[in-house]
Amino acid sequence: MNKKTIWITGGSTGIGKALAIKFASKGWNVAVSARREELLNELSNTYENISAFPLDVTDKLKCNEVFNQIINKFQSIDICFFSTGTWNPKKEKDIDIEQMEDVFKINFFGTVNSIKAVEKYFRDKKDGIITIVSSIAGYRGLPNSTGYGP
């Protein structure tokens, strides 16, 4: 029987890292992506089932490239867990538009880029799971988050 494979973005820290370790401990192939290559390499050197695929999700072409690298290595992907995100709270008087644009590029468009990289594959396969970690800010404003939320 073939091992199942999960692709996790935002896998160098936090929820993504914890999930990568959990799935690796259950015997899954874990493809972990994030910008910080040194943290990914630390994970892949520590856990046999974890493989590092460095990625900046704001780069559409790179998302597709990494997806193809994962397929080439493992022959399939069963679950995608997209947990890439950033947050930099600021009071309204201190908002930096460029910084806000970066938050949207990573949190929103990065997730869209990741989904677009796998959607045709899952449709053709007629199987697969995409899970997205989101922010409560989509439901309720947070302190010092004037530019991000409802």
Segments predicted by a language model, with ranges:
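Conserved glycine-rich cofactor-binding loop
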Residues: G10-T13
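Conserved glycine-rich Rossmann-like NAD(P)H-binding loop of the short-chain dehydrogenase/reductase
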Residues: K26-L43
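The beta1-alpha1 cofactor-binding region of Rossmann-like NAD(H)/NADP(H)-dependent oxidoreductases
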Residues: L55-E65, I97
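Conserved NAD(P)H cofactor-binding loop of Rossmann-fold oxidoreductase domains
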Residues: S83-N88
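Substrate-binding pocket helix/loop in short-chain dehydrogenase/reductase
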Residues: K91-E92, D96-F104
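Active-site loop immediately N-terminal to the catalytic Tyr-X3-Lys motif
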Residues: K93, R140-G149
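Residue(s) in the substrate-gating loop at a strand-loop-helix junction
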Residues: S135
